[in-house]
């Protein structure tokens, strides 16, 4: 199988007023095409730090990360990040609105995605009116 991700001797340290904190200490793993990886552990063990580094949100202290050309890494947090004062369609459109500008084409594109993923009857609803799984789908779109 072809490796899509290789992480070798990855470490992340933070400086605090109390000294250095080791968030990730020398981890190594790889992921083949069509493999799944679950990252589990106790609170504060470095799961989010690892994901932030892999997604390019944070930097590593040392180590090597090789990502297959063209592959992008993203992740979804357990808690949704939807704005409670916006309906589902407006929440889902927000990223495109900010990155570009609000257009009829963007709204139509997002609406089609929401319908495709089973949210047709919820476009005008607000996040509190949806189940956790439905809110996750909106956040993913």
PLM feature spans:
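Signature (C-motif/LSGGQ) region and adjacent switch/coupling loops
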Residues: 20, 89, 123-126
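ABC ATPase nucleotide-binding domain "signature" region
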Residues: 38, 138-141
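Conserved ABC ATPase "signature" region
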Residues: 104-122
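Conserved ABC ATPase signature
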Residues: 126-130, 134
């Amino acid at each position: 199988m072809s490796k899509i991700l290789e992480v070798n001797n990855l470490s992340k340290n933070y400086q605090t007023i109390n000294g250095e904190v080791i968030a990730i200490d020398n981890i190594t793993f790889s992921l083949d095409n069509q493999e799944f990886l679950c990252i589990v552990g106790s609170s504060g063990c470095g799961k989010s730090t690892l994901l932030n580094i892999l997604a390019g949100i944070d930097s590593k202290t040392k180590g090597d990360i090789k990502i297959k050309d063209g592959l992008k890494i993203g992740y979804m947090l357990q808690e949704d990040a939807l704005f409670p004062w916006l309906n589902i369609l407006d929440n889902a459109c927000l990223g495109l609105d900010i990155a570009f500008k609000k257009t009829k084409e963007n709204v139509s594109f997002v609406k089609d995605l929401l319908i495709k993923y089973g949210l047709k009857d919820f476009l005008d609803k607000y996040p509190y009116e949806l189940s956790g799984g439905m809110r996750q789908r909106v956040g993913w779109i």
